[in-house]
Amino acid sequence: MRYGIIGALDEEIALVKEQMTEVKEHKLYGRSFYTGRIGEKEIVLVCCGVGKVNAALFANAVIREFHAEAVINIGIAGAIGAGIGVMDVVLSTEAAFHDQDEVMVKYYPFRRSFQADPALLAFCLLYTSDAAD
């Protein structure tokens, strides 16, 4: 399985890139895409820029151009929940738009939330140091 990893900032993807072996750079859409491996896993890594539109565009690109079967969006984010600190790893089981008005409910294909893929979530849990918490 090939994994796409996207992050909004170069600083967010730097540690992932350092862990990769057999790295090759591909220039597409004005960005550098890096293919390689982390252990036995095939990785496609790109800095997508800030915002949900950029995230969607580059998630699409790693799927379409590099045939990624799963996409992981990494990086910093504002925290709403109590007990979440700086440098904590947060894995979502469900995600929702915070900036959509209720008027959107009547327009297809509106969805209030999106469920995380259970297999991908389980995979991510394997690589968090505090997964038991």
Predicted regions mapped to residue ranges:
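Conserved small/polar residues in nucleotide/adenosyl-binding loops
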Residues: 127-133
